[in-house]
Amino acid sequence: MTDYSYRSGTANFWGIVAVFILAYIFTGGMLFGSTVSRLEPETSNRMYNIRFIASIVWIIGTVVTICIGFDALAGWTVCVFLVLMILSLNIYSEPDYYSQRIISEIPDSMYNRFCKFPFFTGVVNGLVWIALMVTLTAAVALGGTVLFLKHNDFMSVVVLLIIFTLHINAHGLFANFYRQIFVGDGKKAGVGQIAFFSFVLTNILSAFLLNMFFRSSRLSEGLLMFVNPFYCMSYHSDGIIVGIIGGLFWFGAGILCNIKT
């Protein structure tokens, strides 16, 4: 059996330790910052500094892990995707009109406004920022497999993480739909309906991708059955209960992120 453990004296041991420390700081800082930002007045662009600092940390972490080696880069990539999954639920609790007001208050050129748009507070802004981060992280992972001459199995894991992020975005959309239709004043019913249909279509699309790329993967069978009821129905008819429980779990997480906003 192959030994994947790391011990003191093993090649890249302290590099791996540094990566995990950096990842913990990155994750904890993002969660703490996004939580504290909600206590600020609504007149402030509360997510700008958080996303900007996170982008700088991402650049530093990526450069450091590339210098250490492929194992460090792989671990960093997984940690980044986990943070993006958490923030995917968080962004749907942001009032979307923030972006329109803030972008009109900044007396800069249109070029500067366009470059700063992903960092502004707002649902659309958050989606753009996460999409950019996912794309850049996947591109770095692909470049790492080529640079370090590794097998493409790692890219299969990256595709799996992208699909997983897609799932959680779908549940965040559905939680936002629930809040606007059943909890809010009902004035955003059109937005809520779009969110609902996006939730359904996203799940169907991700189920199709799972069947295409991971039909025989035990990882997708064990992990993603917990996430997507549509995938359960297409893969194992008796696994629908697991999928429903997983769907309720992520739906509850999305509702919690939408409370008090």
What does each model-identified segment do?
Residues 2-261:
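Transmembrane alpha-helical segments and their membrane-interface loop/helix boundaries
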